Amino acid sequence: MMLKQAAKKALGLTSRQSTPWSVGILRTYHENVIDHYDNPRNVGSFDKNDPNVGTGLVGAPACGDVMKLQIKVDEKTGQIVDARFKTFGCGSAIASSSVATEWVKGKAMEDVLTIKNTEIAKHLSLPPVKLHCSMLAEDAIKAAVKDYKEKRVKTNGAAAAGETTQA
């Protein structure tokens, strides 16, 4: 204890001030991450059986993050009219999900496939150790679009089969 007090005195620190080496230990999030974590946009879910809803469920075994991102598509225009997410994970994963749902709304499905994890990471100023969170968001978008397209094929195939059996 004496050594610690002597070091603080030598450094000109009072007992209430942090030591300079403790400052480097603290990790802070960028204000965009904090904003999307404290005020996440589009939290929730749609009925996964709705033919106009695509669901992407992805996870990162390394850290335990799991992300479900859903899109609701206007079948006439092919435009994403709404999006929802549920994420179990760190603040960066939640923020990445929130940003992804904001960015996909109002866009055509083909356009959202161009959203890259690097853009999400840059927007949130994610450190390299958190890049996997933005990768999950990109993967969830792709998985949701794929799920929607597969549903449309099944729905259209079933409708076509119904038409041929009635003819």
From Swiss-Prot:
Residues 1-50 form a transit peptide. InterPro entries: ISCU, NIF_FeS_clus_asmbl_NifU_N. It is found in: Mitochondrion matrix; Cytoplasm, Cytosol. Keywords: 2Fe-2S, Cytoplasm, Iron, Iron-sulfur, Metal-binding, Mitochondrion, Transit peptide. Its main location: mitochondrion. GO terms for cellular component: cytosol; mitochondrial matrix; mitochondrion. The keyword Cytoplasm applies. Its cofactor is [2Fe-2S] cluster. Component of the core Fe-S cluster (ISC) assembly machinery. Interacts with HSCB. This is Iron-sulfur cluster assembly protein 1.
